Amino acid sequence: MKKLFLKLMKRNLSEDKIRKLGVQVGNDCRFLSVDRSTFGSEPYLIQIGNHVTITSGVKFATHDGGVWIFRKKYPEIDNFHRIFIGNNVFIGINSIILPGVTIGNNVVVGAGSVVTKDVPDNVIIGGNPAKKIKSIEAYETKILENADYTKKLNYNEKKIYLLNKFKENRYN
């Protein structure tokens, strides 16, 4: 099972390939299960800061596809905008970042969020449309209440630790 998991995790586009698409990428970034479609049709309009994690299913839209309904009247119409992601940002699974958005520094974007407007520094956002849920300080306090320190454990040690912590079995 571990080998399958690791194999699936390697299906990512490498940071090098992401840069070759034209995305401007800072240092110490992680791209988890991202592919070419993550960055849309104008990846060169996306700038990502340092220490940013982009998770699977995230989509960046740098254009307004809705202009299609005006194409008969304006055959050449398009509407493009840049997207900026600050430093120390985590973008959760299946989130969508829409054209013209700037996400500040020290931000967590909750899974499934649709980010339609600029996000200030030091907040947790989520929802559709994404809204502030709490400050980064309040989030840190909550996380520390139930934190697990497993980064130095190997796979089996972590498995044993977590199964012991969560012994409840609701189906037997």
Curated annotation (Swiss-Prot):
It comes from the Bacteria. InterPro entries: Hexapep (IPR001451), Hexapep_transf_CS (IPR018357), Trans_hexapeptide_repeat (IPR050179), Trimer_LpxA-like_sf (IPR011004). Keywords: Capsule biogenesis/degradation, Exopolysaccharide synthesis, Repeat, Transferase. GO terms for molecular function: transferase activity. Pathway: Capsule biogenesis; capsule polysaccharide biosynthesis. One of its GO terms (biological process) is capsule polysaccharide biosynthetic process. The keyword Repeat applies. Belongs to the transferase hexapeptide repeat family. Required for the biosynthesis of type 1 capsular polysaccharide. PANTHER family: ACETYLTRANSFERASE, ACETYLTRANSFERASE RV3034C-RELATED. This is Protein CapG. It comes from Staphylococcus aureus. The gene is capG.
